[in-house]
């Protein structure tokens, strides 16, 4: 559902059919779900998560590319114990713009206990770097 919503934002408000592989033909002539203006405003907010000075997704910055999305972090609930102070559910859902159109995806980690880039376990320090590695393999270098 998150990827579907972000794909509508990233594609100018158009209702895009999701696929695991690129299939540009099936997404021609799709109806608009939200206005292009609203799509552009939402896209700017999501890009600011990556490009903004205080953005929680700044670990995703890649020179020459436009990337937007949202990080997420919550404490993991452990049966019989309650919410953990050491295990976290983290995520990044977002898009990268390419010449062929945006690529939209989501990375979700359940029970994360450490971060390779920070002392804090957050969506920006765990899921976002994985998203970045995925898109690096999908898009050419600029």
Annotate the PLM regions.
Residues 5, 42, 70-72, 93, ...:
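Residue-level preference for non-acidic, small/hydrophobic
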Residues 2-64, 113-124, 140-142:
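Conserved active-site-proximal loop/helix segments of enzymes involved in bacterial cell-wall
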Residues 123-135:
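Short, charged, low-complexity patches
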Residues 14, 71-74, 125-126:
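Gly/Ser/Thr-rich beta-alpha loop segments that engage phosphate groups in nucleotides
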Residues 49, 73-75, 98-99, 109-114:
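Solvent-exposed loop/turn segments at secondary-structure junctions
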Residues 63-97:
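Short, Gly/Ser/Thr-enriched beta-strand-loop segments that form substrate-interacting elements
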Residues 92-93, 101-119:
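Short, well-ordered beta-strand elements
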Residues 3, 18-19, 68, 96, ...:
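Generic beta-strand/beta-sheet core signal
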């Amino acid at each position: 559902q998150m990827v579907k919503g972000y794909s509508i934002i990233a594609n100018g408000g158009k209702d895009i059919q999701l696929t695991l592989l690129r299939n540009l033909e099936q997404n021609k002539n799709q109806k608009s779900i939200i206005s292009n203006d609203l799509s552009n405003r939402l896209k700017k907010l999501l890009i600011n998560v990556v490009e903004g000075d205080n953005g929680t997704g700044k670990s995703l910055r890649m020179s020459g590319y436009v990337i937007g999305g949202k990080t997420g972090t919550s404490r993991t609930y452990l049966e019989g114990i309650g919410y953990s102070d050491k295990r976290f559910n983290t995520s990044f859902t977002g898009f990268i713009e390419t010449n062929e159109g945006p690529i939209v995806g989501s990375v979700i980690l359940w029970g994360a206990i450490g971060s390779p880039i920070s002392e804090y376990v957050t969506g920006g320090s765990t899921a976002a770097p994985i998203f970045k590695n995925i898109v690096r393999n999908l898009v050419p270098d600029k």
